[in-house]
């Protein structure tokens, strides 16, 4: 029995019956396009993920799109199941509209360009959610009521002379190391080392043009514009936030040194197109035993608890790198940065999306 030709005929028939793909006849206009991929290894490897951030910008409109996926065995399942598919927002100053798109569900919300009013109850709920999330992040396992302070802080930045092309950008390499010495009242010491592998490119005219368009949009948007992550900095704000959150024993007055770390990288010339950061800790200040492990009950009361109890064995089996792993790894890579023709349809709600507010 010749089954394969029958399948081929059936497939051809289905293809013939399928609705033809809509042709996009909207005009093309110059648009700033900025695309960045951020790979976050997570604190101690927990819940590693990758997010693609893309912006299309004109003087009176902007589309921002985020696609999130887990990169570890466990986080791949969790992130893709809960937040997979990505989301986007379209701001149209010419129409005073803000559309929020859920790309997987094909749904959207509509608000004025500066956003819908947020009820006080919703603000309180969001704050509680952020606080709960902060509690779940891994932290140092240290002695109770023990504090550490910074005894020395040293930066070393070096151009290596190495050059290569990264996503079409002619890039030059810098390496840097930031070494912090932390001590407790018993004179026990921990050494914190943040290493940087940074590739930069001269700020060429296409890049300047893209930034100029974005600045023009922000000026038109007004003071209420909420800035996104600044990917022009070699030291991303997320890294210092995660470091500060993990170092639970560090005195509050010393945390400012973490927040100001990026200023020490001012010797680096050019625009970063690739940055890889690793953070290592070594020592026993405050009896440091590494990341705090969240205990799970034998009968989890939530999906999060059940998934969390599964995470440990999955990570140990499939995600533990050879050698001492870093507490944190973080990579930022620029994929696109310039002005190019883009269809007007990018700034409209796609056909078939359902309004849900």
Report each predicted region and the residues it spans.
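Bacterial N-terminal signal peptides that target proteins for export
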Residues: 1-8
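Extended soluble regions of mature proteins
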Residues: 23-357
